[in-house]
Amino acid sequence: MSGIPHDHYEPRTGIEKWLHSRLPIVALAYDTIMIPTPRNLNWMWIWGVVLAFCLVLQIVTGIVLAMHYTPHVDLAFASVEHIMRNVNGGFMLRYLHANGASLFFIAVYLHIFRGLYYGSYKAPREVTWIVGMLIYLAMMATAFMGYVLPWGQMSFWGATVITGLFGAIPGIGHSIQTWLLGGPAVDNATLNRFFSLHYLLPFVIAALVAIHIWAFHSTGNNNPTGVEVRRTSKAEAQKDTVPFWPYFIIKDVFALAVVLLVFFAIVGFMPNYLGHPDNYIEANPLSTPAHIVPEWYFLPFYAILRAFTADVWVVQIANFISFGIIDAKFFGVLAMFGAILVMALVPWLDTSPVRSGRYRPMFKIYFWLLAADFVILTWVGAQQTTFPYDWISLIASAYWFAYFLVILPILGAIEKPVAPPATIEEDFNAHYSPATGGTKTVVAE
């Protein structure tokens, strides 16, 4: 699979040769786990295995929960309470599934920001990056529909607000909204559709993950230096790489164990910490909650959605130019989806010839401002749209777009990066000096 020179699987026994000539699945598994991997990967390269664990956890717990769930507006809330009270281990299954979604998004955000910092989106890994963004979009759709299924107050009203965004599309919006809901409002048809799609999408995600893995196995892994593995010969490649098994698998298993220690502590001792108490109240279309908020992992983009009100000058200009077609609501919808889309375009927006942020002094400053901006958007997305939160969300939203659309293209032209090492071997030896038996040495970055 990888373009890096390495030893491929060779069948030895008769049964291995027979199977290999008909279905080379052993060779596929061998090339997957023995892929040459840059030897200088740091601890930010653990999130892939955490994400794989989360996907398996969500599929397994979701299948079992679906056996006991009833997708009907009169029975959904009661069926969830039945799972919690009467199904053996049902409460643990639900808490694992709900908190597993949070771990899934924590890991994917760290995975994305690691890629943004180390330039994992740059050539030749654009396809890997775009497939990763498709996975993220599928995760968001799956999580949103899953949040509706318990049929609590926040489930119902969250679905009403979010699906109402499609109604903001000029001309065809209401038709799309009605088609999506299966009627004029969130009701039984909506719940059935969301349950069916929520069950289906994890398997779509699994297929996209397989393509994602295939893509980065074809190009090889990125690494903290952004320097490519030497591919002139197998001997040269071995100076820059080690096999994924056992070196990085052991490291990933250890990291996963540490992450799961924290995860199971949350599941066991404070399983509702990341949830919302209003969702323990059955959905009531006649009673609107005082403050409607989505799950925490949607809050950054929810903040961007709410930031652009009718009194913002950008919205007023867009409304004037479009002769009233683009109002504040539609502008907010465009901004929310644009904030996600702009991440998919980053391979072409970042014009710097240097891949890794480790060697880009100006880039580091703006990147960490972006990370802080993301945290601020998450926080302000859970607040009321009153002063000063409305101004904070507007400023934070403006910086999000400015980073990708203005700062990155300009930095590529004006920044003077530090020269990266010539090879991965050179970087590895600088951090783990052979003279000290591989002991880590402190090197300024």
From Swiss-Prot:
Subcellular location: Cell membrane
Family annotation (PROSITE patterns): CYTB_CTER (PS51003), CYTB_NTER (PS51002)
Ranges facing Cytoplasmic side: 2-49, 114-129, 217-252, 347-364, 409-445
Cofactor: heme b
Principal subcellular localisation of the protein: membrane
Positions on the Periplasmic side per record topology: 68-94, 150-193, 271-329, 383-388
Positions with a binding annotation for heme b b566: 111, 212
MF-aspect GO terms: metal ion binding; ubiquinol-cytochrome-c reductase activity
Function: Component of the ubiquinol-cytochrome c reductase complex (complex III or cytochrome b-c1 complex), which is a respiratory chain that generates an electrochemical potential coupled to ATP synthesis.
Family per record: Belongs to the cytochrome b family.
Entry protein name: Cytochrome b
